[in-house]
């Protein structure tokens, strides 16, 4: 028996050697964890809309970028994991454009049924099409490596690939919302300031504490022909009319107080299922998630089974698991945006973005409050936000964008909404590109290059308040028809009742620029009309609807750019097919010497004529 056992051991050993030789991995010749080192000009932590816009804008301006996102999808609060609606400045003429508009138009083109999972991929596509971006999904920042006062690298862990990353960079952008790069020692705040610290009259007596606005788990409903009762899990709350039976506080001046709990199905995304403001929205995140689940199931059970039949034709289609956050950490920058900045319209020399949502200050007690859930103060139509809100006052190579910018609690109550944070992300990413270009710091960009930053943002279709874009020199030196002169006013949208555009009939009309002498033209910049005024960009609150959305009908679909050479002939120098974007920045294959340039529209997405806001020769 001993010889048999010895023979078996020998055979097993030989088999193992053969298996390893053939490529089988075992504990002897493989790893459980992996280590990888990466390096880029700009490292962006956080892949919500602010982080996406920051990464893409920096990449398009020539930087190598690493985007680190701890979730499997991009989009943050707007993603399919959370499904919060994107809102921003009030009024059609104030609609946020730039990269956010590009993403939303891509969604219209490739997601006509407005499904949330496909919306995720509209955001994803915007990132992965940029060759300068390395995207790390499912990757959480765990620590920072410092070099004196500066951040030298991030340490991160990828849960899918079991990989430890050391990510080196020259500039670091925190778009996480929760401010993980505070590990650098950057100054920050959590909670509500006293009213007298910044003279914020709307704070009242509710300041000087660590309370914040809460988190929310959302619901999505589906219309149905049949009515079936709903039973919530045993661990959920079970509400009755008494839980919703209290007086709505009346309006007051200067704020309007609302309860907002609306247990009815119409036009409802259930943002008011909110909790966590009285505790810590970071440290207590798991407890908050469970409490919100208990509330969400209880709310739906109450609504669905209500004797008045308010939800008899609805079923619960989706309930969130990941809460959306409104507030946690606010970094401290050279400027702290306050209530007074917002209400005085934010006339800053270093303006780089704008807001326009109300000062929407949620009660930390949130859903469990029997009083008001929010106090909204009407703000100016739009207000400027300065560059000094986007970089650290004490860590020289740290910038930030999103809900962790430098602001008071009251200031953040307006700037935290996602259309605004997308603009802030684009501004931060563009500013980061200038930091890399000049080998300097955000503070020095603020001091020496703010005008260049503002021009770049406007050129990228990010409107800035209290100023208009400067058309190109070539455009201004050309002659054109009186009707086309509006294209060189720098106002790339309808504004205060003025159209600011021209109508072009496909196959019949064109926009023509002429020069007295031949000029060298290397490209063109065009702003088509994406119909801010006629549509909503928000995802649907009801799931499984079959109504399709379309690319805006007056958008130019197919077009040509033609140049007239010295021979007097029109030559096509660029042809665009299937266009669905508002901003087109076009580089010709090679510069052309011409004494005329024209934009020819071949087709639209359904309208009889295309509407164009700008056509610049470059």
How would you name each of these model-derived features?
Residues 1-17:
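Bacterial Sec-dependent N-terminal signal peptides
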Residues 13-42:
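Extreme N-terminal leader/targeting segments of oxidoreductases
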Residues 18-22, 29, 153, 160-473:
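Flavin (FAD/FMN)-binding glycine-rich loop and adjacent Rossmann-like elements that form
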Residues 21, 31, 39, 57, ...:
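Conserved N-terminal/central alpha/beta ligand/cofactor-binding core
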Residues 46-48:
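Glycine-rich Rossmann-fold phosphate-binding loop(s) that bind the pyrophosphate
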Residues 51:
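N-terminal Rossmann-fold NAD(P) dinucleotide-binding loop
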Residues 469-493:
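Predominantly extracellular/luminal regions of secreted and cell-surface proteins
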Residues 495-572, 577-618:
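Aromatic, loop-rich ligand-recognition surfaces of beta-strand-rich domains
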